Regions:
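Internal alpha/beta loop-helix hairpins
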Residues: 175, 185-255
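Conserved ABC ATPase "signature" region
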Residues: 59-63, 103-120, 126, 171-172
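Catalytic Walker B motif of ABC-type/P-loop ATPase nucleotide-binding domains
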Residues: 149-153
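ABC ATPase NBD coupling module
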Residues: 61-76, 100
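A short, proline-enriched helix->beta-strand linker immediately N-terminal to the Walker B motif
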Residues: 143-147
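Conserved ABC ATPase signature
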Residues: 124-128, 132
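Glycine/charge-rich catalytic "coupling/switch" loops of P-loop NTPases
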Residues: 254-304, 321, 325-352
Length: 352
């Protein structure tokens, strides 16, 4: 377990947090820019001196009389800007971390294979793409034999394809190494796709924490739908890969969904997805003759209006919840109300 009570003042900004987190899975530290996410992560890593205490798995990292330096905390840190040594090649960057690490359970070759960096080992840092450099930075953190991984906005600055690529690697790392991870982000979609739990921050304080799906469901009820465009974390099982159409077939509570092909996932594996509310349309009768391939029946659970006459509709599908964001005019035309059967229409590309 990670326990931390920290206070720190920087100019007009004050960090004041009290955390109790289980040492498993991927936990997001989420909130708007400037809320203190990176400051908190650096304090936990020992890169920033603060008042308070930090304890990890029973070991005191910081209290009134103790401050274990960053290099002794067994915490692997992945910086937003990677911090790789440009004068060394990839292999030497990894060796720099490996040679200074205590012996641990993480095997060097496993890291190389899992992150797909074998072909990069002889390359110089300056010649790497953004996604390649990020994989090397993650590999360097792992070969240092950490007991916990701390990641500061690791997808920042990457294009969409590279982000999806790195998210896939991060999911595999979580499954393969079972290393507890704290993941700083202000992007709700990447958090929903990757993280099991969330810590919500605002103005230097923790305002909520819990399972990702529950926290995002709370955000769907906010009156500020511009700040939180909303959506749902859904879990669907991989049932087939349709290579002829470059699609993966998913099972959501007995209903078929088609997503862009994810051949890295095994048949029977459960996939965690984020479905943005803006990408869900609604119908009161099953439509025909549409290009949209995903039609999921459900029941209207709640309707929540914002100040701009937009309605966020919660649709219950078995034990999961989808959300659609529509206009008030559309809601009234469909006569939507709790308990009404509807069909949720989802484009396959929305499940990328």
């Amino acid at each position: 377990m990670l326990e931390a009570t920290l206070n720190h003042r920087i100019g007009d900004f004050t960090l004041a947090v009290d955390l109790r987190l289980q040492s498993s899975g991927v936990c997001a530290i989420f909130g708007p820019s400037g809320c203190g996410k990176t400051t908190l992560l650096k304090a936990l890593a020992g890169l920033l001196r603060t008042q308070g205490h930090v304890k990890f798995n029973g070991q005191c990292w910081q209290d009134q009389n103790t401050h274990v330096p960053a290099y002794e905390r067994a915490a692997g840190f992945v910086f937003q800007d990677n911090r790789l040594f440009p004068h060394l090649d990839v292999a030497s960057n990894l060796d720099f971390a490996r040679q200074r690490a205590a012996k641990g359970r993480i095997e060097y070759q496993e890291v190389i294979d899992t992150l797909g960096v074998q072909s990069l080992l002889s390359r110089g840092i300056t010649g790497l793409s953004g996604g390649e450099a990020k994989r090397v930075a993650i590999a360097r953190a792992l070969v240092s034999q950490p007991k916990i991984l701390l990641m500061d906005e690791p997808l920042s600055g990457l294009d969409h394809a590279s982000k999806q690529d790195i998210l896939g690697y991060l999911r595999r790392l979580n499954q393969h190494f079972a290393l507890p991870t704290l993941y700083v982000s202000h992007d709700i979609e990447e958090v929903a796709r990757l993280c099991d739990h969330m810590v919500m921050m605002r103005s230097g304080q923790v305002v909520d924490m819990g399972p990702t799906a529950e926290i995002i469901q709370k955000l769907n009820q906010t009156s500020d739908q511009t700040a939180h465009p909303g959506g749902a974390v859904i879990h669907a099982k991989v049932s087939a890969h349709r290579a002829d159409f470059s699609l993966t077939e998913l099972d959501l509570a007995g209903h078929k969904l088609f997503a862009p092909i994810r051949s890295d996932l095994s048949i029977g594996e459960t996939m965690q997805l984020f479905l943005p509310a803006r990408d869900v349309a609604l119908a009161t009768q099953k439509p025909e003759g549409l290009s949209i391939r995903n039609t999921v029946p459900g029941i209207v659970d709640t309707l929540h209006a914002d100040a701009n006459d937009r309605i966020r509709v919660a649709i219950k599908v078995a034990d999961q919840m989808l959300f659609a964001q529509i206009t008030r005019q559309a809601s009234e035309a469909l006569a939507l109300k709790p308990g009404l059967p509807v069909f949720a229409l989802v484009k396959s590309v929305a499940l990328d």
